[in-house]
């Protein structure tokens, strides 16, 4: 589909003129298959989704159609391809797990049972992937994995009902930031952390299908913070004029209160680890947001942020 917000990072970065891009609806199998067959990909990263919890309460049918049948359609393209790809990664969410509100991070072998329509649709997407993997690719001819990523933040996100975009919008209006759930704990991480993990998983299973599996992708325990703490860090990074207030909603739809991931499997299998702690993550996010608000050079700021890859040294 077209980017769902105006502005959006795809347009701001001028990517349309720098890559082959096909706009379409993943629910439309015929159109998806035509684009898939034309591309003949060797590696497939499935990130298309309706990704907002609160939107899933407003339109659960669309959420399930997109997140469940969209996954079915994508895997049908893989199954029926004349030359199937060698590596497929389905990106789901940390919210696929049955949330017991306990202090431990969920592991990949925990029960999948998301509560709200968004989370549950992603649990279903996991099960669909598992079924296709067992039913049609048990010979390992196509290496298929899923990645269950924690809450992603960073510059260039303009979605509704997400904490960092809400913070930036408030700063643009010179208003106090309203926080709905300041005491909720989430595995927040900069967007480049999971993106690096996705590419790593896709590459390694392309080279050796024994790496195919199910992987949590999230921050270290020390960076699993409350939303209130996250916004404190945002305000510190932003500087003068940044402040927030608790705007809890009395009849808000259910959202998990405490959620953490155990990423031991990803770390031990690939030697992966997060590169930025939350304070540095927020500094990068605020820097990007200020460049955007001032009408600065977004592609140049993205290049600066991508120096992330050199931070591993």
Language model region names:
Residues 1-149:
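N-terminal Rossmann-like NAD(P)+-binding domain of SDR-like oxidoreductases, especially those catalyzing
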Residues 27, 58, 66, 116, ...:
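Residue-level signal for the nucleotide or nucleotide-sugar donor/cofactor binding architecture
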Residues 58, 149-156, 178-189, 210-225, ...:
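Glycine-rich Rossmann NAD(P)(H)-binding loop
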Residues 100-105, 109, 117-118, 123-206, ...:
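NAD(P)-dependent short-chain dehydrogenase/reductase
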Residues 167, 197, 204-252, 262-263:
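Mid/C-terminal beta-alpha module of Rossmann-like enzyme folds, strongest
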Residues 177, 201-215, 294-300:
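Core catalytic loop region at the nicotinamide-binding pocket of NAD(P)H-dependent oxidoreductases
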Residues 270-299:
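A contiguous, mid-protein "functional segment" used to position or interact
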Residues 308-313:
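Conserved small/polar residues in nucleotide/adenosyl-binding loops
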């Amino acid at each position: 589909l077209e980017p769902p917000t105006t502005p959006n990072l795809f347009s701001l970065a001028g990517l349309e003129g720098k890559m082959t891009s096909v706009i379409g609806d993943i629910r439309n199998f015929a159109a998806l298959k035509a684009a898939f067959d034309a591309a003949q990909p060797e590696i497939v990263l499935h990130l298309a989704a309706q990704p907002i919890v609160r939107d899933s309460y407003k339109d659960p049918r669309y959420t399930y159609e997109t997140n469940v049948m969209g996954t079915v359609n994508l895997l049908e393209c893989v199954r029926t391809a004349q030359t199937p790809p060698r590596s497929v990664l389905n990106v789901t969410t940390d919210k696929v797990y049955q949330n017991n509100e306990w202090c431990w991070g969920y592991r990949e072998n925990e029960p999948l049972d998301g509560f709200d329509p968004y989370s549950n649709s992603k649990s279903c997407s996991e099960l669909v992937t598992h079924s296709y993997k067992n039913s049609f690719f048990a010979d390992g001819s196509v290496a298929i994995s899923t990645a269950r990523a924690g809450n992603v933040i960073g510059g260039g996100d303009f979605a509704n009902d997400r904490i960092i975009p809400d913070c930036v919008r408030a700063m643009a209006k010179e208003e106090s930031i309203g926080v709905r759930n300041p005491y909720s704990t989430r595995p927040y991480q900069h967007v480049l952390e999971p993106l690096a993990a996705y590419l790593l998983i896709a590459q390694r299973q392309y080279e050796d299908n024994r790496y195919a599996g199910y992987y949590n992708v999230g921050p270290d325990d020390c960076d699993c913070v409350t939303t209130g703490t996250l916004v404190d860090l945002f305000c510190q990074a932003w500087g003068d004029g940044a402040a927030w207030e608790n705007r809890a909603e009395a009849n808000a739809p259910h959202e998990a209160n405490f959620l953490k991931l155990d990423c031991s499997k990803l770390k031990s299998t690939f030697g992966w680890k997060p590169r930025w702690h939350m304070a540095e993550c927020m500094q990068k996010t605020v820097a990007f947001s200020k460049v955007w608000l001032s009408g600065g050079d977004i592609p140049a700021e993205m290049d600066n942020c991508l120096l992330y890859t050199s931070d591993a040294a």
